[in-house]
Amino acid sequence: STIGYWLSQKTNYPFFDADKHLEEKENRIISDIFANEGEEYFRDLETKYLKELSERQGIIISTGGGAVKKKENIDILKQNGIVIFLDRTIEDISRENHENRPLLQNIENLWKLYDERINLYRKYADIIIKNDDDMDVVTDRIITTLKGKL
């Protein structure tokens, strides 16, 4: 989300965090949805709101890490956009605050999810960008790479 925001600032394209968009539309936080309705219900909502966002032109969308679990989500995003995977080490990911991410509450689960998803991220990405530097450098990498794709 942070990189998406920075990219938006540098390119003047509007930025949408898909998880925040979902929370605003549902008037609840994701952890409550998981706790009360479960992951499958959340994933269906995620798809619904990704469809809504992807109908817009010229925007930047940041998705949650699990969006890749449903191929339909990837197909939706690729219809009008370019899917960028920000490649980070699991060590870097583990240092973040994950209090609002129900599936990332312990390190064992983080490793499990990483192992489940990493190949999907790489498979579905149109572009893979190393996210191993400060925001300014990473956003410049994205912009430089996109210039060759647009």
Enumerate the language-model features and the residues they cover:
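Walker A/P-loop
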Residues: 1
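NTP-dependent small-molecule kinase module
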Residues: 6, 10, 56, 82, ...
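ATP-dependent small-molecule kinase phosphotransfer cores
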Residues: 14, 18-78
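Structural signal for short hydrophobic segments within the conserved structured cores
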Residues: 14-16, 102, 127-129
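Short, flexible helix/strand-to-coil boundary loops that buttress conserved ligand/catalytic motifs
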Residues: 26, 34, 46, 54, ...
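Short acidic active-site motifs
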Residues: 45-49, 72-73, 109, 116-117, ...
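Short glycine-rich anion-binding loops that position phosphate/pyrophosphate groups of nucleotides
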Residues: 64-67, 89-91, 134
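A glycine- and Lys/Arg-enriched "phosphate-lid" helix/loop adjacent to the NTP-binding pocket
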Residues: 80-119
